[in-house]
Amino acid sequence: MAVISKVTYSLYDQKEINATDIIISHVKNDDDIGTVKDGRLGAMDGALCKTCGKTELECFGHWGKVSIYKTHIVKPEFISEIIRLLNHICIHCGLLRSREPYSNDINLKELSGHALRRLKDKILSKKKSCWNSECMQPYQKISFSKKKVCFVNKLDDINVPNSLIYQKLISIHEKFWPLLEIYQYPANLFYTDYFPIPPLIIRPAISFWIDSIPKETNELTYLLGMIVKNCNLNADEQVIQKAVIEYDDIKIISNNTTSINLSYITSGKNNMIRSYIVARRKDQTARSVIGPSTSITVNEVGMPAYIRNTLTEKIFVNAFTVNKVKQLLASNQVKFYFNKRLNQLTRIRQGKFIKNKIHLLPGDWVEVAVQEYTSIIFGRQPSLHRYNVIASSIRATEGDTIKISPGIANSQNADFDGDEEWMILEQNPKAVVEQSILMYPTTLLKHDIHGAPVYGSIQDEIVAAYSLFRIQDLCLDEVLNILGKYGREFDPKGKCKFSGKDIYTYLIGEKINYPGLLKDGEIIANDVDSNFVVAMRHLSLAGLLSDHKSNVEGINFIIKSSYVFKRYLSIYGFGVTFKDLRPNSTFTNKLEAINVEKIELIKEAYAKYLKDVRDGKIVPLSKALEADYVESMLSNLTNLNIREIEEHMRQTLIDNPDNNLLKMAKAGYKVNPTELMYILGTYGQQRIDGEPAETRVLGRVLPYYLPDSKDPEGRGYILNSLTKGLTGSQYYFSMLVARSQSTDIVCETSRTGTLARKIIKKMEDMVVDGYGQVVIGNTLIKYAANYTKILGSVCKPVDLIYPDESMTWYLEISALWNKIKQGFVYSQKQKLAKKTLAPFNFLVFVKPTTEDNAIKVKDLYDMIHNVIDDVREKYFFTVSNIDFMEYIFLTHLNPSRIRITKETAITIFEKFYEKLNYTLGGGTPIGIISAQVLSEKFTQQALSSFHTTEKSGAVKQKLGFNEFNNLTNLSKNKTEIITLVSDDISKLQSVKINFEFVCLGELNPNITLRKETDRYVVDIIVNRLYIKRAEITELVVEYMIERFISFSVIVKEWGMETFIEDEDNIRFTVYLNFVEPEELNLSKFMMVLPGAANKGKISKFKIPISDYTGYDDFNQTKKLNKMTVELMNLKELGSFDLENVNVYPGVWNTYDIFGIEAARGYLCEAMLNTYGEGFDYLYQPCDLLASLLCASYEPESVNKFKFGAASTLKRATFGDNKALLNAALHKKSEPINDNSSCHFFSKVPNIGTGYYKYFIDLGLLMRMERKLSDKISSQKIKEMEETEDF
């Protein structure tokens, strides 16, 4: 099939509809001929098509038509377009609403876009009547009546016939079409002679169950039947129009309906594009529960017999396979045979006689049961990133479940508690070859962004790795027994005794070095814990091996070590019993006694405080502060438990070094002090969204406690441990948390999945070009992909070494640091980066040497400098800044840290060039990779926990998925969180006093009212401690009261005095007279006074000022003060003295003030911060997404394709159901370049292996052939001449 390079959309014209010869004229009959279920409309449900005789896989369906007897029916989706056009013309005479376009001076084809727009505005002018002297009628406003289902005159609601509108629109001369933005004949907006009946293929049945019996209906077929019925009855225009609208889009005339119609099946989540084209059900697939298998490797997948006997693979007949196919036929292993000449598929059954069908000519194929070592794609849903779907070799395994190697369980987020996986056997040989390379686990070993291995040991293998390293005094036989099948090549090197370290050296098998970890292939660390053997760790031995050699060696280490760990466990055993956890009750009894004693002390102290408040001895704290103090006391109790357990673990290790539970803790697997605290100490405070449960009826959560009880246990503090067991009320509190978490998980899964799809759709067409730049279509997004122009899985985070005077080249390093340090001090100067990005893991090639053999200091500096200059020019074209690379090499290879030979230095830089040249290929789908990594991480995060920054009643800066969602949606006109930072606290305090909301009621005033002869007197007594606590002054309180009364419309006359009652209290006396009705207005005044006498912006949040240590440099810090405030606009800060105050606005304020590039930087850092600690490696995908959102002149939401030239098909698959309608209306022509369009037209997209176009220069072959023939002919002539000489 020819490659489709361009697609044009348009509306069907009436001639095309009339051209079909399948006439539908019956509503119902016995054989369905002439009905909307006519077999001539296409093949369905196994029946061949009666028009072309093909099956439903080959027949694309045929259109029918029903006569509408010269009635004019508007195409429902274009009603608004018709109304738009009618606003430009006079409905009486059909002329445009301005005489100017008819002028002889104007040639519409020569007008500029600007002049055309001006002319169009004149047509839309507010003139009341027609300029045409023969018409002079007032202009009519036409609208569409949902009630009457027809066009009406808006003024008097009189029907306007479709035929009249049709006549007026088709009478508009073609030369005026550009002016009215008409792109095709207006008649195409109507059906006139016939209405089209679509083929059966686009009307799939909708199945449902009634009384356990499957039924199926087809609403579209029913709605088409109604149209045919009305046409046969020769019904009124409105009746047919209504039937057509109900079939096309019922929402045009009815708001609250969910009936299925054409619009429904092309929009929303389950539209036909998504269900049948973008993704659909496939043949040759299987699904089963998964289980672990120790007999298969990371590159294999175990398949049970029933799947192997059901799935079939194709073998194509050619000169190489014909003998094999004959053998398979002879041994009765062939299930199907396809004869290409006869276009016939034959099922071969036992004892079935087949005559003259099997010819075995090239192009034929046979299907046999799937064989071992065939490549098969399998995966676990949800497939959040590409490590969830891989292609491995099939192995036959026992039982009824799919078996996977435990090494890949982490990458697929799989455990073996009933998880299911699916598999699909691809039939196209090209697809099989491609998947067996690109999706093979060895290819996918290292994470695309993180760079660490995605496969590794799990569960008891981690403990085995720890124990194996510590084992001593093994004889050769014991070593060979542990190594099993891998022991044949073990070289004892004359030794008699061996340790676990020797076994690791043999397994590593390479002379590899790594600072503090490996020396010549030998582990020099004190212990082997989980960091060395599990997935997604930078110190993983498999990762270091693959950095040193290739992924093949890395995978081999995982396969061999996994086998050896399992051998070790089967020989020496490992088990954890309850006795390991709790040898006796002494420790738990001691902890319980401590907990009971401490909680009683806390309760006693709290009760004393509450009593003193009640007795008036002390002034109460604010509610938030009181809750903070109680929480801090309970936290101290929790920390006490953890300290006791840590001491207990340390003591147990001394007394019993072989305690298996503590071995697990040391190995970094499972048990930590917090988990032990839940089991042995106390279950702790139960929280919902980070807060204790809120009180409900009678000021309590559960009826187990007294009304308004302040008991911490009544708010969800569970004192008992799990060993002791929970009481009824404690169990309810734990279930309260479980209920909220399970609800959150259900909701968050849906929300994160929706955003993930949007981000992937947004970023899918972003690829690396041939120059190592990131582009989307023809738009340049980034000059250097991954900042290093090296594949993300090759780049490596390394320690950031700060300048130090003890370093060689200190001045040069210091100068470089001053150029790049801004990038490493981030998050409002609160954080200093500890890591930076190295172009590759060069540390595995660093081999220490002696002073005598080392390269000269000057030579090494020159080498680094020359290499970086060369790379800057030849690879980065001096456009991108690569100072960070020079800084890394100068610090990590610094002679003051390590001495290396000249050969080592040359090796490192040869590898550097090798990575630059060969790792990052043009077409790398960096957009999809980044989108998947971001999505996978925020999905995990949303399901694991919800966390925020502030706890002191301030506005909470949300972290996690919610905030990420807000940032990518980029909603306008919402308040933004503005952060102000300064070393001068007074400047922040002036802002705080003006903005922080404080009302009279918060100061706990004692308000009394008395009536004097001619006035009311209100006494307001306030304790000055409350005024001080609110960080305001007595004058501010006086101003608050004064301001409220002066603005009050119910007060007729007023006066005010302030008195100092005593050293603690101040009294404000207000004298009042009210307007009539006096009693009512007095009541209103007293009711609103505590809240209405206020200052600041009304908000439920306080504005506390907190201090922190800010970094100016790695060795320079200063004390800074910070506060966050919610503002709509920065203009509100305009009247304050904010000199030397750093203001960090939100994204839209950043854009308004500093422009698009600043907004990009803000978005990148804000998105990264939502992930919390330990996710610095996500900077690159966050930067890429931020760069895309800010690729135009204004930030653009992930929900929209406002600026980019997104294709119609991309919009349609994204969920825009109007995209195809608009494209057809505007007769759009588009190239087939982007992912969605390529998918639709079966074209290889320009990403990955489809980026480069491969071709053969036939002209070269022809020239070569001519040269050869010339050479041969001249040689023959020479031979003939020689012969003639004789």
Swiss-Prot record:
The organism's place on the tree of life at top rank: Viruses
Location relative to the cell: Virion
A single GO BP: DNA-templated transcription
The keyword Nucleotidyltransferase appears for this protein: yes
UniProt key word Transferase: yes
Reactions that this protein is recorded to catalyse: RNA(n) + a ribonucleoside 5'-triphosphate = RNA(n+1) + diphosphate
Keyword annotations: DNA-directed RNA polymerase, Early protein, Nucleotidyltransferase, Transcription, Transferase, Virion
Family: Belongs to the poxviridae DNA-directed RNA polymerase 147 kDa subunit family.
Subunit-level organization: The DNA-dependent RNA polymerase used for intermediate and late genes expression consists of eight subunits Rpo30/OPG66, Rpo7/OPG90, Rpo22/OPG103, Rpo147/OPG105, Rpo18/OPG119, Rpo19/OPG131, Rpo132/OPG151 and Rpo35/OPG156. The same holoenzyme, with the addition of the transcription-specificity factor OPG109, is used for early gene expression.
Function: Part of the DNA-dependent RNA polymerase which catalyzes the transcription of viral DNA into RNA using the four ribonucleoside triphosphates as substrates. Responsible for the transcription of early, intermediate and late genes. DNA-dependent RNA polymerase associates with the early transcription factor (ETF), itself composed of OPG118 and OPG133, thereby allowing the early genes transcription. Late transcription, and probably also intermediate transcription, require newly synthesized RNA polymerase.
Protein name: DNA-directed RNA polymerase 147 kDa polypeptide
Species this protein is from: Variola virus (isolate Human/India/Ind3/1967)
Taxonomic path: Viruses, Varidnaviria, Bamfordvirae, Nucleocytoviricota, Pokkesviricetes
